[in-house]
Amino acid sequence: MKYKGAAIQYDCHFMDKEKNLAALTNLVRQAAAQGAKLIVLPEMCATGYYFDSMEQATEMAEPIANGQTVRLLENLAKELDCYLVAGLPESDGERLYNSAVLIGPEGLIGRHRKMHHYVPDSTWAKTGDEPVKVFNTPIGNIGIQICMDLSYPEGPRLSRLMGAQVLCSPMNWNEPSIPSSIWLTRAKENGMYVIASNRHGNEKGFDFCGGSGIIDPEGRVVACHPYGDGIAMAEIDLEMKPDRSEIPLRRPKLYRELQLQRYPWYQSQYYQAYATEPLLEGKQFSTAVCSMKPENREEGFMAVKQAISQAGKQGERLLVLPELVLGGVPDDLQQAQCVAIREDDPVWKELSSLVMENHVDVILGFVIRRKREAMECSSMLVRGWFSTLLSEESSD
């Protein structure tokens, strides 16, 4: 199945619902006239975003079932025979949510409540309390994630695992680099379309940068409206099979530690209850990252030594180097065998000595050859005379 998708962009005026509804109605009609079947509107599309108080938010919020904005969108979807996704402040009678709705010619299909709040949300909205949903429609399986939700991989990943083919994202995005690399990453890593509808303009001193766009399952921007009012439109091809060769298959068995992680808890309380040794004092230190592209092992080793020496002279205490920096990126198995480094290679002793001289810890990537002759893409923390394998990805 193929059809046109569209991302609507306009300057949303704060607390002026009538003006905003008129603007979005005009642009939705334009998009539908150009053949769009799935049209995405910005986050908080009729109200503006930076509410000063709960009172302001309450004044603008609507019930999903019979609110002014939803009624208008239902009428448009029915008249224009299209599907609309739009963000709005929702009132359920007791609480307020930053929500988005999916509406089709048949009426309201479903909603999503924003799970990851940005600063303005915290003044009025309750965090989304419903699980991720994917909605089956005549134009495919549609997921919804609102703005900041896209900054976290879990929501888009769950949407894809539940069958989403298109992820619609109403935005109030103010990052200057647009379309954001985050949008492209979510499309690429999940192999699904992302339609991101952002607003433009200034609200209370905060600039919204526009750049609404459509990203295909390969992570390519196939439509973008950089500035001002307008529409980004592109073909949605549900039969498109993205090339997954660059992204290895998921390996959930390696992610189990996430279920046992303790980071959300107060560290002092955790250590008081479970630690066998005192909690280390926090320290500030200087760190550095270094970009390089060595063509072979010798060139890579020289570049690494120079980077360590420079970091030491600058007083850095941690240096992070690129993946596969020792040897470069192999084109095939034969080349990987040539650049692979054994676990007992003298290079580790030399690197350990060098980092000890310069008082800097180093993290770097390489291809390692195990004793069983299998090769792995690994990363290593080199600290004094001690090297620790941090991660590995088998390629045997």
Where are these predicted regions, by residue range?
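CN hydrolase (nitrilase-like) catalytic-core segments centered on the catalytic cysteine
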Residues: E62, G67-V85, L150-A232, A340-I363
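Beta-strand-turn-beta hairpins that frame and shape the catalytic cleft
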Residues: M1-G5, V134-G143, V166, P278-T287
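Conserved small-residue-rich
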Residues: L24, I39, Y270-R342, W348-H359, ...
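Residue-level recognition of beta-strand->loop/alpha-helix junctions
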Residues: Q9-D11, P42, R113, N198, ...
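C-terminal beta-strand edge segments of enzyme domains
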Residues: K133-N136, Y193, R199-Q284, S309, ...
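Active-site catalytic loop in hydrolytic enzyme cores
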Residues: E62, S91-Q165, P170-M171, E175-S181, ...
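Short beta-strand scaffold segments in enzyme catalytic cores
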Residues: A86-L88, S99-L102, K133, A196, ...
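Active-site beta-strand/loop signature of hydrolases that rely on acidic residues for catalysis
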Residues: N20, V28-T58, A77, L84-V85, ...
